[in-house]
């Protein structure tokens, strides 16, 4: 279990940006892990298929907070396709022994999600780690992009 809570993961938890809610989000979605009760709620604005603003409220374990911290740092400027690819790669990394997400062509530093690769061996932690991705994808569906 100590392998999960590395200093790098704890450093992410200590600096989570974009906490709160947007005044007038284009989409809002939340997710709850049935296993541990972790909860994430995200607000998102998009213009011309690109994320222009984002905020989130997080009541989650360190792993859910760490993935949310990376999401908040990298999401502005991302396209719906980029976000779907990152979410797909995260699921593959955790559930199918896949490779971690890679940096995007526009410069999104998604490769830092590799810090969560050790979660793969703890299936009971997958849901909380993926909450932010699930909520963002729900927002994309709401926006029809």
Where are these regions (language model features)?
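C-terminal binding/interaction regions
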Residues: 1-19, 78-145
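Structured beta-strand/loop patches that form or line metal/cofactor-binding pockets in enzymes
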Residues: 15, 19-58
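Proteins with a high burden of low-complexity, intrinsically disordered sequence enriched in S/T/G/P/A and R
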Residues: 35, 69, 103-104
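Secondary-structure capping and boundary motifs in well-ordered enzyme cores
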Residues: 36, 63, 124-125
